[in-house]
């Protein structure tokens, strides 16, 4: 999630009555393929259409290009087949540092089951000089 979040930063995560939404930063449990929880950004949720144009470096959800000022590197293609429509009960996530992020573009992570979402990262508490809400 570099530059939005860096390793060892401490976050407040909320999970009460949470439904994932596009653009949210979420903490995901290890699931079946991961050794530890990961932090990623929700790109598309169940029922939404998704297209990633790797040549133009653009992401489209429901036919509209999404504005991603937080992305810190070019989007590279992974080894996973990206579905045209996100299946029920799943979300598609990517990290903000797209060149090196292990996310839904890769089979190791793939589509995320909504039951594997720990919660939404709301607020950074450490380091002190970066305290604030996450958007």
Where are these regions (language model features)?
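Soluble "head" domains of membrane/secretory-pathway proteins
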Residues: 3-135
